[in-house]
Design a protein with these regions (language model features):
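Phosphate-ester processing/binding pockets and catalytic centers
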Residues: 1-153
Length: 153
């Protein structure tokens, strides 16, 4: 994943900062890796309720990941306050898991863990598909499981 930076001196990859050729290369790189991507897509997401929508999506993601026997979710770190909010959301979601199920969340800076860029690439490809640019989505369609989340925001 690190090679996707190219010759640019950037700390981490951002889908919205890539040109179409770079986006395609990123999706092709991702398609060549082992893995399966669960994507929680919340709607509606009003600008003033983004954190609430994120929490609803994160809660659903915990339930889905646990069903695949995932025990650790690594999220890209944000601020200490927002990271703590994520942790509280995961703690709350664990009450809906079967008794004795292990599940935890950790935060890592995006610049330190290139595998976190996969989430940005998948989200970008899915958003592009919803905007009518289906090529990116088609490259990874067999690797993605989309979960629609009603955010009630």
């Amino acid at each position: 994943m690190s090679e996707l930076r190219g010759r640019r001196r950037i700390p981490k990859l951002h889908w919205n900062e890539m040109d179409p050729a770079e986006q395609e290369a990123a999706v092709k790189t991702l398609a060549g890796l082992d893995g399966f991507h669960l994507v929680a897509i919340g709607s509606p997401v009003p600008r003033r309720r983004q954190e609430r929508a994120r929490a609803r999506c994160l809660r659903r993601l915990v339930l889905e990941l646990s069903a695949f026997d995932v025990e650790l979710l690594v999220l890209e770190s944000r601020t200490a306050t927002l990271n703590a909010r994520d942790v509280e959301t995961v703690k709350g979601a664990r009450f809906d898991l079967p008794k004795g199920t292990a599940f935890r969340v950790a935060h890592e800076p995006g610049k330190d863990e290139p595998l976190l860029w996969a989430a940005d690439i998948v989200a970008g490809a899915i958003k592009a598909g919803k905007d009518g640019r289906l090529g990116y989505r088609r490259l990874i369609e067999d690797l993605v499981y989309e979960i629609a989340v009603e955010t009630d925001c």
